[in-house]
Amino acid sequence: MKFIGFIAAFLMIGTIILPAQTYKPAERVYVKTSDYVKGHFNGETPKKKATIWVIGDLRDDINEVLNGADSTPVRYRYWRKDNKTLWMLNSVARTMSITAGVVVEDGKIVDITVMTYRESRGHEVQSRHHRVQYVGASITSDNNLTNSIDGISGSTLSVNSMKRMARMALLLHNDATSDD
């Protein structure tokens, strides 16, 4: 009888402790960075990644885009060939970050792809139907996208995160190519 009581106590404690552990959904890696970079630079990877420092007006613009959702990094690394730039950006959706690759050419988005998705829900942002809305978008003088992006029911925070990354990539591209 004592043995049964011991087992019952063990099972009750186990059901209390296990749910208290932090739940972390599995990362969904859709595309590897090296494959994505090669795919947008004709099978080649530019020899050296460039760096852009976030200072002055650029910092103010990025802070406006992030609106407190993420902290503003001091610098961003990117790949560049002629007037095409490729950015790997992270943005928090609900609790976890999304990593997206954004390709910008001549001030317009050519491609946006979810590289790694870490949230437990909202993964629909990686669908082609959603991503195609960003193609051809540029940034307005008040740092908004020129294209209207439709939301996805149940994925509002993930959609907002993707919009932030698209806007950031356009701002960064414009600053990086302004010397030309």
PLM regions with names:
Residues M1-F6:
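Positively charged n-region of N-terminal signal peptides that target proteins for export
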Residues Q21-I149, S155-T156, N160, R164-D180:
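Flexible, solvent-exposed loop/hinge segments and secondary-structure transition points
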Residues I7-T15:
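Bacterial N-terminal signal peptides
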Residues I16-A20:
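Sec/Tat signal peptide C-region and signal peptidase I cleavage site
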